């Protein structure tokens, strides 16, 4: 073909591509697949909606009652529906907070090691250990802390022992969240910092960590939400109390899961109301933490999209 002919061919308008309509067989397959996935979604959604409806319907009266959030059960008889869950809510937040104080620094340092320094056998062993720890049941973590902290070292049951068990459950979540966020930081930023003569540790602290911090904070909040409802550690490692205990290292301390378990043995109607009220309170706490994590992710995403 001559050059002139090729130029003329290029000057011709491009004909629109004509798509053939889907055959009946393909339309049927698409309809079947759409119906299957929608049905699966509805089937998975029904238990969740039903659970929330039952808990809200049965616990709403308790959580909206005066004094529920500001009073404890000190001096309240089993047949009386009085007081509130202030002592249990305080214990839940304190135990999760102490666990976070211990687990977050250790988890973040482990994540930094795996992403920035980890090579060879040590890195593989650490990754394998974190994976195994992520699948450990809460009762196993509680029994381990009981055998080491209480039976072997001689410390008494306390909220701090519960926090140690929660650390074992939080640690793999924090490590994975930190590792994923650190890997999302572009290597070009690290290389540019190294080219300017900045040491590696200062590059991590001044450049890598601030960029990954919103995602890391979100992962930390999700790890806290994962452990606030754990029941096995509080059943094994601490006793129940009807009043507030400010000492983390000594004495019994109530929590929302422990309050639910204790009130289940109360045959009075007041116990029934407290059980469902505590369950709804626990759901509200977990939902609030998850909402905070989602808001942090949303704000961080919007800041990245803003023009410079």
Curated annotation (Swiss-Prot):
Q: What induces it?
A: 4-fold by phosphate starvation, part of the pstS3-pstC2-pstA1 operon.
InterPro entries recorded for this chain?
A: MetI-like, MetI-like_sf, Phosphate_PstA, Phosphate_transprt_permease
Cellular compartments annotated: Cell membrane
| Every ABC transmembrane type-1 domain range | 89-297
Task: Report the principal subcellular site.
Answer: membrane
Give GO BP annotations, semicolon-separated: biological process involved in interaction with host; phosphate ion transmembrane transport
Where is it found, in Gene Ontology cellular component terms?
A: plasma membrane
The UniProt record lists the keyword Cell membrane: yes
How the protein assembles, per its UniProt entry?
Answer: The complex is composed of two ATP-binding proteins (PstB), two transmembrane proteins (PstC and PstA) and a solute-binding protein (PstS).
Record's function text: Part of the binding-protein-dependent transport system for phosphate; probably responsible for the translocation of the substrate across the membrane.
Q: What is the name of the protein in this document? A: Phosphate transport system permease protein PstA 1
UniProt source species: Mycobacterium tuberculosis (strain ATCC 25618 / H37Rv)
Its gene? pstA1
């Amino acid at each position: 073909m001559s050059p002139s002919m090729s130029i003329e061919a290029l000057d011709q308008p491009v004909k629109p591509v004509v798509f053939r309509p889907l055959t009946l067989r393909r339309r049927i397959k698409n309809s079947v697949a759409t119906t299957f996935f929608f049905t699966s979604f509805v089937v998975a959604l029904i238990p969740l909606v039903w659970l929330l409806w039952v808990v809200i319907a049965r616990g709403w009266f308790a959580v909206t009652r005066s004094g529920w959030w500001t009073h404890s059960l000190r001096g309240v008889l089993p047949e009386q529906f009085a007081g509130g869950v202030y002592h249990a809510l305080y214990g839940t937040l304190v135990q999760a907070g102490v666990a976070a104080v211990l687990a977050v620094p250790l988890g973040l340092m482990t994540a930094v090691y795996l992403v920035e320094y980890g090579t060879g056998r040590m890195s593989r062993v650490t990754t394998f250990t974190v994976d195994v720890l992520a699948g450990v049941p809460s009762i196993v973590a509680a029994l381990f802390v009981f055998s080491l902290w209480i039976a072997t070292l001689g410390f008494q049951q306390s909220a701090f022992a519960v926090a140690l068990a929660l650390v074992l459950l939080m640690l793999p979540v924090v490590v994975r969240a930190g590792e994923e966020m650190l890997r999302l930081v572009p290597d070009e930023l690290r290389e540019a910092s190294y080219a300017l003569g900045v040491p590696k540790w200062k590059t991590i602290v001044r450049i890598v960590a601030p960029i990954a911090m919103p995602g890391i904070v979100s992962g930390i909040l999700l790890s806290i939400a994962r452990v606030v409802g754990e029941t096995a550690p509080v059943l094994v490692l601490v006793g129940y109390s009807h009043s507030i205990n400010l000492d983390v290292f000594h004495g019994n301390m109530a929590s929302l899961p422990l309050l639910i378990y204790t009130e289940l043995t109360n045959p009075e109607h007041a116990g029934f109301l407290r059980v469902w009220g505590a369950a709804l309170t626990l759901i509200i706490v977990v939902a609030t933490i998850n909402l905070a994590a989602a808001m942090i992710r949303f704000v961080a995403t919007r800041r990245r999209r803003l023009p410079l």
